[in-house]
Amino acid sequence: MKKIVIIFCCISLFIFSGCVNLQKSTTNGEVSFNDSFTEELTFPFNADYQQIDFFSPDKWDLWSRTENKLFHDFSSEDEIFFVEYKALDDFSISINNEMNVSEGEIYLIASNIFLPKGNISANFILYDENDNVIDWVGGITTLSPANGYQSLYCLIYVTSEIKKIRPRFIGEGNTIAKIKNTVLYKIENKQKKNSCIENDFLKVCCDTQTISVTVTDKRNGQVYEQCSENLKGIIFTESSVLENEIQLTSYDKKGKPIIKSMIKFNSENQASLDYSLSMPPDYTFDSFSFPQKSMSKENDYLVLPINEGMCFDYNDEHAFHGELVTYSGHGLCMPFYGITNQITGAGFVSIIKNPDDCAVEIKMNKTNCVGPNWKSQKGKFGYDRNMIQTFFTDGGHVAIAKEYRKYAKENGTLVTFEEKKQKRGIEGAERLNKLMGAANIWCWYSDGKNHTADTLVSQILEAGIDRILWSNNQNKEVISKLNDLGVLTSRYDIYQDVMNPAYYNLVSYIHEDWLPQAYPNDIATNKDGSFVQAWGVERKDNKGYINCVALCDITAPYYARQKIQTELSMKNFGSRFFDTTTASSLRECYSSAHPMTRTDSRKSRFELLSISSLEHKLVTGSETGMDFVVPVCDYFEGMMSLGPYRREDAGRDVDKFFDNVPSQILEYQLNEKRRLPLWELVYHDCCVAYWYWGDHNNTFNDQLIWDKRDNFNALYAVPPMYWIKNEEHLQSNKERFVKSYKSSAEITKKAAGTEMISHKFLTPDRTIQQTQFSNGLTVTVDFSINQISFN
């Protein structure tokens, strides 16, 4: 183990003597400078260390987004650089030239900073061979205000695509800082580059410097590679190989061992790898990617459970790029991702076993790449993170979905309708039977006449739409009449939005489901003590919105038990719909009265829905969908509607109908070339999926768009959703509603409660597709001519 003690020089990274000095030390030498600030760095690996002090004040570029608000000075006596920024946006201080670098080099910025106000970050701008920026904030680390000087470190590993770097400091908002004793270090890592393990199915090699993994499937010769991306200031320097595993150790910017990573063969499946990531639970942590992103190749496509599911070809520059969290209905609704070859069907699936604090990131790096990014638990590492990656030789996206279905069954997430019926007794089973094939109809009944909902529903039934889920709250008598008509009666409910009662006289409406008694004591609290913001409500004066705040999930079950029990004693609902519960992200709460991690949030939301489904035997629905609630939730409104590609303001203009079709609807939302029924392949026999109430079957007046939604309903064997404004709207569109419903009704009824066992693209252009169900039902849809057929 090599140890270097550095007594940092009294030379600022910004204000130097006007020349470039290179002092090189190898082995166990001590490099000392005349200053009182001492920091010990331990790098326990075979390396050369090169300390670089350089550049006078005129060698630095100072930039601010707001002009004339960045002030600086230099004290030559104690060699302190002073900076003050008097604006709310950002500023930077960087060297005015890029530095040429080579693969395998490691660069470290170390500085001593007094920060009484604002924030300062050290990072590197990273450039490729064409001087394009790869990353504006490579290896970024950030300081928060504190009394006295703090150490700030930033470290990067130079990967193959990085050809130049530019060290810099950046800040945001009103900031005051004193910066001294800054050193730039170049470290040449001489560690062994590769470690490998092998069994009868797979050969696995890990680049121990970049932690990128190459897997060769020995059954078909397929090679799977990962990107070598920057590791956010972490160096992996030690590796050991056992019979079935590779163990890696990394060191942080102070040279302390912090991360233990492991890649090993799964004990039950030779074609599977287990990845694990360990740190001290209280280690300050933002995010970290392990393993690195997997690269797609020619003829591959990415498989992502964005709501029902999507695929993006390996070279699709318009694929979704960015992060999709695994703890929100507007991320990945099931915690996995995969890549498969559309010709051979070979590929892999990666299952995130700790989804509460994780995201999956997709980016273009010559081809589309995808991998996990582990998030902190309230700013700390918290607990070990695990992922399982399984390789297969055929089956494509169906094999990916079925491998996850097997995992969901093993961990208790997959609970079928038949199992739910057994748990809920005769009355609960009868209610679930009403859900099968039921059109989900929303109506706020605004025709101004003295008609009641049962009048409208009777007309819908008489027209031929014979199974209905109705979720608009009505009085006791109307609910009884609807029940007598065989309708599955439900009502909208929400346990997220709470409006400050002081604003009731300012907003355009007061929602019956707000909980004024929860304000302010039971509201979710941010780290800075502010309340978590929720739905914005229009002001009476039309001058914008006033936000609700979010109820802390831990407190929600208490309010739900009181409310639901009281209401059911008066109204015999058969169902209940919980808005936002499985759409909004799991939350952290920093209240001392009800602190909450995202794991606590998940457990509380599960309990909330179980009050309805298990305690009261009601058919239970929620918005968009996350699969951890499948055991206690029976339908999702929005699972069919791909979240990133809905029309603008789909959550607000729910009762409007549109002539113009936005481009994202055609290119993504209803594009059969990009959609996959992943949710149905996993959970068709457990839950019913609907379109979103602002993205329903009749959202657009264009009949071709309506037809296409009907086609997807038939192919996936899921019932439609309609918005009906009033009786006049029903009568003027009755034939179209009935045609739409009947285009899939027989299919959805026959397939109800069955497993979807297969989905195929029957033509290379993916316009003809086929699904098959466990009872033998086969559905074929030709999207090019809007033709539906089934056996």
PLM regions with names:
Residues 1-4:
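Positively charged n-region of N-terminal signal peptides that target proteins for export
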Residues 8-16:
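Bacterial N-terminal signal peptides
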Residues 26-196:
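Extracellular and organelle-lumenal recognition/adhesion modules and their flexible linkers in secreted
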Residues 28, 136-139, 190-499, 620, ...:
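Carbohydrate-recognition beta-sandwich/jelly-roll modules
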Residues 171, 279, 781-784:
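Asparagine-centered strand-capping/turn motif at beta-strand->loop junctions
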Residues 206-215, 342-345, 363-413, 429-435, ...:
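Active-site-proximal substrate-binding groove within the catalytic cores of carbohydrate-active enzymes
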Residues 491-566, 658:
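Active-site-adjacent "subsite" loops/lids of carbohydrate-active enzymes
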